[in-house]
């Protein structure tokens, strides 16, 4: 019994016959003290057993479960909780639908955003004359890359580089030996790839020349065609002709652009081949589907290299009449054998033939395969020189059939005598004939025409630049025009060139050092202009009144003013001296009024006689005379010197395009209005 009790006592204390209750046993369970101390056994140590604390059972620990379901339902059904909840729910639903509806509405009413080729100027470069990087006297691709910072400082958005393909003609124009090779004088394919990457790193775009009509007579295709080798037999236009004692009798009277017969006898094939240009430039046979596929494959090759677009040159020559009928003489009384100049025939059977536009549209479809990524639209421009305005407009395509984004507008380069009337006629001719919704463009120069300064005179260069940047559409500048470069005199040149176009291809004038800073070589492929000591980039950078500084101001104005890129254009007046027009946009009160004097003497304009509610004074935003910038002019008597131009600005709530008196003289490519409250453009106005 005691043994059992001892087992139950976890702790026992013995002190001189006293027992203390440890609190874990009942008092009655403690045995009584032995009266005989001697009979007590020696105390033995007792083990203390402390049980480990029990781990709480996981199922016993539960989170707070909240209000029971029955109670929750009791409260949630009360009106003071149910009504706010339903209001918030339906407000959320309505807000979501309103947001979706507003987004759809903005998308529907907003006009199409401007593409990159619409949003800024294009700068055309003749690569052999821009900048030499390897000291051989010839410009090259690395030279262009070195000057990209200069180009971006002009607020240029797109570079247009003319032909750089491997060519047998020394002026590297159109006689291409290999469409997939860079001519060594310009560099390597790696140089081109580096240039494309650098251009894109600067946020710029690149378009290049492409000449599908013909090749060099040294092209492998032509060499194979001469020997009737396989599929290349009909890659060119061959026809039987007689050749006796070195004298060729051609199949018909068709003439080359450069004069004389467009047929040349080939000693290998014993037939005549057709060439619209030089005999070294045989025309491809675009009635052969295999030729069209070859050209599309070349287009794909350059697009895969990162090119953003093409200028398709000489496309009106792609097809000729099948039956080889003689073309009609301009002067029917002229002896046929004396007709040798291109202008002496009507070229009804060798240009703009039925099916030509279908080929161009097919090129467009090939390019569209690379235009599907956002911001990667591929541009197509078409060269349409010497075409009537009606034929030129055909390159825009049809309402539902896409073709060129625009044909290049070179009509300013063909003005005979500069005046207010002739400038007005060029503008109205394009704007009145351009299909609805299409985009205009304006060029003042190029490698095939005399330079702007030499055509119109240095005193009108600034006014022409002001015109270029304030007209609606894309301005296109030929290298050197921004500083007023002129033609050079070329005599006794001993290479195979079209000498009439060499005058506008002189080296770019960068500074007043040797060779105008174009090259460190001892010679240049063409002579520099003798005025390069004063007409150069470095000098004009520091002159507030220089052509370069005004060009930069105008390009910046074009880039920052929505009115100039999207607004209405209203022609108000033209005479032998002046052209007056406004640029305005619905929703923006600020209006630009442009006055330009292209006459041979000074003139005075009364603008209030044209616009009755015009303020008595207007502020000059920009002027060809930098000293008058920011000042005010009397609108009843604006005095303009010869070649002077002003960009005036004022505020009005009554834009001219909404007034019946001016409505028929106003044009817009894509109708747009501005909401200042939402800071958006919309088209339903």
UniProtKB/Swiss-Prot annotation:
Keywords of this entry: Amino-acid transport, Calcium, Cell membrane, Disulfide bond, Glycoprotein, Membrane, Metal-binding, Phosphoprotein, Signal-anchor, Transmembrane, Transmembrane helix, Transport
Gene giving rise to this polypeptide: Slc3a1
InterPro entries with a match to the protein in the record: Glyco_hydro_13_cat_dom, Glyco_hydro_b, Glycoside_hydrolase_SF, O16G_dom_2
Localization, UniProt: Cell membrane; Apical cell membrane
Residues exposed to the Cytoplasmic side: 1-88
Major subcellular location class: membrane
GO molecular function list: metal ion binding; protein heterodimerization activity; protein-containing complex binding
Function recorded in the entry: Acts as a chaperone that facilitates biogenesis and trafficking of functional transporter heteromers to the plasma membrane. Associates with SLC7A9 to form a functional transporter complex that mediates the electrogenic exchange between cationic amino acids and neutral amino acids, with a stoichiometry of 1:1. SLC7A9-SLC3A1 transporter has system b(0,+)-like activity with high affinity for extracellular cationic amino acids and L-cystine and lower affinity for intracellular neutral amino acids.
Subunit annotation: Disulfide-linked heterodimer composed of the catalytic light subunit SLC7A9 and the heavy subunit SLC3A1. The heterodimer is the minimal functional unit. Assembles in non-covalently linked heterotetramers (dimers of heterodimers) and higher order oligomers; the oligomerization is mediated by SLC3A1 likely to prevent degradation in the endoplasmic reticulum and facilitate heteromer trafficking to the plasma membrane. Disulfide-linked heterodimer composed of the catalytic light subunit SLC7A13 and the heavy subunit SLC3A1.
Membrane-topology descriptor: Single-pass type II membrane protein
Entry binding sites for Ca(2+): 213, 283, 317-318, 320
Biased amino acid composition, Basic and acidic residues: 1-10
SS bond list: 241-272, 570-666, 673-685
Region (Disordered): 1-53
Tissue expression as described in the entry: Expressed in the brush border membrane in the kidney (at protein level). Highly expressed in renal tubules in the outer stripe of the outer medulla and medullary ray (at protein level). Also detected in the renal cortex. More abundant in male than female kidneys.
GO cellular component, one term: vacuolar membrane
Entry's Gene Ontology BP terms: aspartate transmembrane transport; carbohydrate metabolic process; gene expression; L-cystine transport; L-glutamate transmembrane transport
Protein name, entry field: Amino acid transporter heavy chain SLC3A1
Classification via CDD domains: AmyAc_SLC3A1 (cd11359)
Keyword Transmembrane helix: yes
Organism of this sequence: Mus musculus
């Amino acid at each position: 019994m005691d043994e059992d009790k001892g087992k139950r006592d976890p702790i026992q204390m013995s002190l001189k016959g006293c027992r203390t209750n440890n609190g874990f046993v009942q008092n009655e369970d403690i045995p009584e003290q032995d009266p005989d101390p001697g009979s007590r056994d020696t105390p033995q140590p007792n083990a203390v057993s402390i049980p480990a604390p029990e781990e709480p059972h996981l199922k016993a620990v539960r989170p707070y479960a909240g209000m029971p379901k029955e109670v929750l339902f009791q409260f949630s059904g009360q009106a003071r909780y149910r009504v706010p909840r339903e209001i918030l729910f339906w407000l959320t639903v309505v807000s979501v639908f309103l947001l979706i509806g507003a987004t759809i509405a903005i998308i529907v009413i907003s006009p199409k955003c401007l593409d990159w080729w619409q949003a800024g100027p294009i700068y055309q470069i003749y690569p052999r004359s821009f900048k030499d990087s390897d000291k051989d006297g010839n410009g090259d691709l690395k030279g262009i890359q070195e000057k990209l910072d200069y180009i971006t400082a002009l607020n240029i958005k797109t570079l247009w580089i003319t032909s750089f393909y491997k060519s047998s003609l020394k002026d590297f124009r159109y006689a291409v030996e290999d469409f997939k090779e860079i001519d060594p004088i310009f560099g390597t394919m790696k140089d081109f790839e580096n240039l494309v990457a650098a251009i894109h790193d600067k946020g710029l775009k690149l378009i290049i020349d492409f000449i599908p009509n013909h090749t060099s007579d040294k092209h492998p295709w032509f060499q194979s065609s001469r020997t009737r080798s396989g599929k290349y037999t009909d890659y060119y236009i061959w026809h039987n002709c007689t050749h006796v004692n070195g004298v060729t009798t051609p199949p018909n009277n068709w003439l080359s652009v450069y004069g004389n017969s467009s047929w040349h006898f080939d000693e290998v094939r014993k037939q005549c081949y057709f060439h619209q240009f030089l005999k070294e430039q045989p025309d491809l046979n675009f009635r052969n589907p295999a030729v069209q596929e070859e050209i599309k494959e070349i287009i794909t090759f350059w697009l895969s290299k990162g090119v953003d677009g093409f200028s398709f040159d000489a496309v009106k020559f792609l097809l000729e009449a099948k039956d080889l009928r003689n073309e009609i003489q301009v002067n029917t009384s002229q002896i046929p054998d004396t007709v040798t100049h291109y202008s002496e025939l009507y070229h009804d059977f060798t240009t703009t033939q039925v099916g030509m536009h279908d080929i161009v549209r097919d090129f467009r479809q090939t390019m569209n395969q690379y235009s599907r990524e956002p911001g990667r639209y591929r541009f197509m421009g078409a060269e349409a020189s010497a075409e009537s305005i009606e034929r030129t407009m055909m390159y825009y395509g049809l309402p539902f059939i896409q073709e060129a984004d625009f044909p290049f507008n070179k009509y300013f380069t063909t003005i005979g005598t500069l005046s207010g009337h002739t400038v007005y006629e060029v503008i109205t001719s394009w704007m009145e004939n351009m299909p609805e919704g299409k985009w205009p463009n304006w060029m003042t120069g190029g490698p095939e025409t005399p330079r702007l300064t030499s055509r119109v005179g240095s005193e009108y260069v600034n006014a022409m630049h002001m015109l270029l940047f304030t007209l609606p559409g894309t301005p296109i500048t030929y290298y050197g025009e921004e500083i007023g470069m002129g033609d050079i005199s070329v005599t006794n040149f001993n290479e195979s060139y079209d000498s009439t176009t060499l005058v506008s291809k002189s080296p770019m004038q960068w500074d007043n050092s040797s060779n105008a800073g174009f090259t460190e070589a001892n010679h240049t492929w063409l002579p520099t202009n003798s005025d390069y000591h004063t007409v150069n980039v470095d000098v004009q950078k520091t002159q507030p009144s220089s052509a370069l500084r005004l060009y930069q101001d105008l390009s910046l104005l074009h880039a920052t003013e929505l009115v100039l890129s999207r607004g209405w254009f209203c022609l108000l007046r033209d005479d032998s001296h002046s052209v007056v027009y406004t640029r305005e946009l619905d929703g923006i009160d600020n209006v630009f009024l442009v006055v330009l004097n292209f006459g041979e003497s000074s003139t005075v304009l009364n603008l209030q006689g044209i616009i009755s509610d015009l303020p008595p004074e207007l502020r000059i935003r920009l002027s060809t005379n930098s000293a008058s910038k920011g000042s005010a002019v009397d609108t009843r008597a604006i005095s303009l010197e010869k070649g002077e131009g002003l960009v005036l600005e004022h505020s009005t709530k009554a834009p001219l395009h909404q007034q019946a008196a001016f409505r028929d003289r106003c044009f817009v490519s894509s109708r747009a209005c501005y909401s200042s409250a939402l800071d958006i453009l919309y088209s339903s106005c």
